[in-house]
């Protein structure tokens, strides 16, 4: 029996609500361990609704209509989001708009809604490394992406940042209870 599965929900690594009103967006294969834990199991544990993407072609439209409170994305998804934003707002123009306080607030709000992340309380990446520069880029848009690390062998969540610390550069946090980490 993997005690990681038993201890993780008590630590609430995604900081989801216990009110049953959480909203999750499912698009990874259902046998993917991150999909199982971050979406399915967390929803069953804390309550909420799981919405599924209809197809790869409707992914953005589906995510935009769902506006989940918890979103897990592999780094490639965030790269595609970033490329989409930069195709409409080249970096120089985006920097200029973000430097104007009122415009910056409105732009961040609109972009988060377009991305489907306007209601997200937990925005997580994992399954592959995400460049710190990309996380900083998103942070400048008001989108704080938490880095996670785990593997199938320990039921997905191996490490997490403690308490209210949701972002620390180049860190995936401390080992979960009952998880031993050895670096050779």
Regions found by a protein language model. Give the residues of each.
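Conserved AMP-binding/adenylation subdomain of ANL enzymes
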Residues: 2-23, 30-110, 119
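Active-site-adjacent beta-strand anchor residues
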Residues: 27, 52-53, 124, 148
